């Protein structure tokens, strides 16, 4: 046990986590040179295309240190994006230490800070590493000062390396072995194993990634899931050397994978404790806090025949992604589908892309909304995650919207632009601190505004230098209204949106104009209106297509022309009574972009 080191790598997006892990695998000989690929741990196609890490991956390597001992390194590569911070906290729960990788050119960013604090709260040993020292722009001294100033850990003897060229990576490993403590635990106590992650394999059923805290897990043992009391047989277990390798047992302190032929997706929830059926442990390990979705959107299959497949796909995906929430929903305009909860817009995009790719589905997404707290006139408090569930205006005593606390780190020269953006998003400044050339800003901004497009706009006003970390703070009373869209007098539930009273006329007008461009012309007039309650705030009309019925009258009497026009008018009127309007898919997506281009 004293030779085991469990650690994970935390860093901001693009500071070189995945490249560093490639180097570590190479030095320890986890893969032969032929199998080595760049970013070997980003196994999903989507991860490679976008160049981001989405899922945490684990690897077990043997490293022969300079003191002659051979150490077993279990390391977990974690995502750096704000939407996936829960993946990071899960990975950290399985470790005793963390490598804090900071780009020697860019310096400390918001995500570095957030993940580092998470690690410190869990009492992990944080080892700072300055990466990318081969870059001409690298300034390791300045960055070391920044780490001390902003994060508050001693960084002057931090390891300097370049993951791309491989310089200094052996020093990183030596420092790891020296500074990170070995796991604590009793190999003879009853088995306790924490499920860090699980995913669905078409051949094996549910595969779980586990960290053995106490005791030993052997192949063929009867294993009990503590929350459900179900007993399973440990069919296969082993480690990743990125490849799956079978073992006969996992010892105390190790991280490995386990297959017990669980076919039911809910069989082994993430954060649960496994123990031996014969000699069970008294209590479960502390798990993870459940992450609450921040953004909700309706997902509907384009053809209703796909509904069953869609449901299965969501089930399998939610096993692999513990923070995905879903419940059935039906809409008059779109048929049957699911209301899904996500951690942020990137998470929503990724899930939608994974569903379309891995499970071959075509989906329509409605506009994302956040959760509102509504106090009705009968003093009852309800939570509303979709505009169509909002009670009528006269039944609402008070509507409270979620406020997010946003921590931003940015270079001084962009301060003005960023503050302007925050004010436009109805933000309230709570703190501002200067660290050298960087400014740390704290704002309280309504979650709805953060979720919409705040991140993109923040990046563009600061030329990509600002970084953001946000978390839910509280609910606050606010003057929010629901804007409905009526087409020929009928409400279309999927197009409703909840917005602030001050922006409502503007958003309504913009939405109506967008719809006018997208709805194809029909044989009769289509009236598109935006309304708050019964009060219409905007209207536009898609003009009808009409035939020129007077073309065949050369001269002729005026009463003849009148008769033909009258006849056409009556026909159009009849058409309008029976006609219905088909809404194209683009119309639903238009809501997502309201308020993006205009401003």
Swiss-Prot record:
Domain tr-type G: 2-184
Membrane topology: Peripheral membrane protein
Location (main, coarse): membrane
GO CC annotation, single: plasma membrane
GO MF assignments: GTP binding; GTPase activity; guanosine tetraphosphate binding; ribosome binding; translation elongation factor activity
Keyword GTP-binding on entry: yes
Origin superkingdom: Bacteria
Annotated GTP binding sites: 14-19, 131-134
Compartments reported by the entry: Cell inner membrane
PROSITE patterns: G_TR_1 (PS00301), G_TR_2 (PS51722)
Main EC class the enzyme belongs to: hydrolase
GO biological process: positive regulation of translation
Enzyme Commission code: 3.6.5.n1
InterPro entries, per database record: EF-4, EFG_III/V, EFG_V-like, EFTu-like_2, G_TR_CS, LepA_C_sf, LepA_CTD, LepA_IV
Key words, A-Z: Cell inner membrane, Cell membrane, GTP-binding, Hydrolase, Membrane, Nucleotide-binding, Protein biosynthesis
Catalytic activity, as annotated: GTP + H2O = GDP + phosphate + H(+)
Family recorded in the similarity comment: Belongs to the TRAFAC class translation factor GTPase superfamily. Classic translation factor GTPase family. LepA subfamily.
HAMAP family: LepA
Functional description taken from the UniProt entry: Required for accurate and efficient protein synthesis under certain stress conditions. May act as a fidelity factor of the translation reaction, by catalyzing a one-codon backward translocation of tRNAs on improperly translocated ribosomes. Back-translocation proceeds from a post-translocation (POST) complex to a pre-translocation (PRE) complex, thus giving elongation factor G a second chance to translocate the tRNAs correctly. Binds to ribosomes in a GTP-dependent manner.
Protein name: Elongation factor 4
Gene: lepA
